[in-house]
Every structure is written in structure tokens, then in C-alpha cells.
Design a protein with these regions (language model features):
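Short, surface-exposed ligand- or partner-binding patches at beta-edge/loop junctions that are enriched
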Residues: 99
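Short, Lys/Arg-enriched N-terminal segments with co-localized hydrophobic residues
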Residues: 1-15
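Active-site flanking residues adjacent to catalytic metal/cofactor-binding acidic residues
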Residues: 50
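Rhodanese-like catalytic fold shared by cysteine-dependent sulfurtransferases
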Residues: 13-47, 55-95, 104-139
Length: 139
């Protein structure tokens, strides 16, 4: 039994992913756009912007003007039409541009949304770069 137990633990360890591996997969799947491109898309009014940071972070820096605030930990519910938490502003065919603190959470969120059937999801990176580039912000 000890041998079987040790083998099971080793097999399990082989399948575990690190946060770096998750992020690498997300960055490979979700298109990263420059902040200038994001600002142009914002001006066009054709994209949905989502800030995936928590409310405390958003309160301290502000967010992209007109963006939805859907925390990373809630996106699976807000993006799923079958839940009572579905955000009706979301559309699987519309361009969705995600922002977070530095780009990592936006990438992970984008991967999740793509896996849920959203077809045009992009990552504009961190809010600091957006503010520095003088993109429209609201508090």
C-alpha cells in the first residue's frame, strides 16, 4: 500500500500547474493590445471594457470610463447566461477589452471568457498604463 500511495502522490504532482504556467497559457491565447489601440477602441464605442480588479483597487485609482466592474473571481458567473448573475451587457460576439492592475488578471480572465465561448476578447494590460497614456478614466 505504501508503494501505491507514493506513486499516486508523484503522479498527482506531475499534473499540477504553477501560476506561471497558467499565465503563460493565458497570454498565448488572449490577444494583448497596446494601450493606444485600446484608447482608439474606446473612442469608437464599439467595445465593452471590463475592469477585473476588486472594488478597493478601483476606488483607489479609478477605472476606464464606462467600463463594467466585474472582479476576476466573479467572471464565470457574470459571463454565464445560465446563471441569475449573468451580466446582460456582455455579448459573446462583441469585442471585449479587459484591464486589471498589471495585465496578469486580465489575461487569466480573458482565457476563461474564451473558454466560455466569447470570441473577441483582448487584454489592454494595467490601469496604470491607461492613465499614463491619458485614456478616459472615471472614479
Amino acid at each position: 500500500n505504501k508503494i501505491i500511495c507514493k506513486l499516486s502522490v508523484r503522479e498527482k504532482d506531475k499534473k499540477m500547474k504553477t501560476s506561471s504556467e497558467y499565465l503563460k497559457e493565458a497570454n498565448a491565447l488572449v490577444e494583448k493590445i497596446d494601450v493606444e489601440v485600446g484608447i482608439d477602441r474606446h473612442k469608437s464605442g464599439k467595445a465593452i471594457f471590463i475592469d477585473v480588479r476588486d472594488s478597493a483597487d478601483i476606488a483607489s485609482t479609478g477605472t476606464i470610463k464606462g467600463s463594467l466592474q466585474i472582479p476576476r473571481g466573479f467572471i464565470e458567473f457574470a459571463a454565464d447566461e445560465s446563471t441569475p448573475f449573468y451580466n446582460k451587457a456582455l455579448s459573446k460576439d462583441q469585442e471585449i477589452i479587459l484591464v486589471c492592475g498589471a495585465g496578469g488578471l486580465a489575461a487569466l480572465t480573458g482565457k476563461t471568457m474564451i473558454e466560455m465561448g466569447y470570441k473577441n476578447v483582448k487584454n489592454v494590460g494595467g490601469i496604470g498604463d491607461w492613465i499614463k497614456a491619458e485614456g478616459p478614466v472615471e472614479k
